[in-house]
A protein has these predicted regions:
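Non-heme di-metal
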Residues: 1-140
Length: 140
């Protein structure tokens, strides 16, 4: 097979992976709303399709894995590689992404959103720590 890295197909797979992943989360959110509104059959429909979207995302990721994690660029494969990728992603989120987003929200007058993003930064820091502990257990 041709080299995937740096091709338009690589970019297309990354966009498709992101889209399918987001569809999964959106449909799970919609399912919660349908449950609250008393539509359990519609909620089940959303959950069923969300699971299908997960399968689509996993299919894209199978191809992307040969190049590396589409978010972090870190190698995908062994559990230690996957933990390192997770640590890289979570660390970026709590050190750069959410602090930057929070500052922008605050600068634009969205204090409640800024505070929410700061909560998420703390959560992502915790996630990075938990993944780091998981990696350390592999090295024991």
């Amino acid at each position: 097979m041709a080299k995937l890295s740096g091709t338009q197909t690589h970019e297309n797979l990354k966009m498709a992976f992101a889209g399918e992943s987001q569809a999964n989360r959106r449909y799970l959110y919609f399912a919660q709303k349908a449950d609250v509104e008393g539509y359990p059959d519609v909620a089940a429909l959303f959950r069923s399709v969300a699971e299908g979207e997960t399968g689509h995302a996993f299919g894209h990721f199978d191809f992307l894995a040969e190049v590396g994690d589409p978010v972090t660029g870190v190698a995908v494969g062994a559990t230690s590689d996957n933990l390192n990728s997770a640590i890289t992603g979570e660390t970026f989120e709590y050190t750069e992404m959410y602090p930057g987003f929070s500052k922008t929200a605050r600068d634009e007058g969205f204090e409640e959103i800024a505070e929410w993003l700061e909560v998420l930064a703390r959560a992502e820091k915790s996630h990075a720590g938990r993944f780091t502990q998981g990696l350390e257990t592999l090295n024991d």
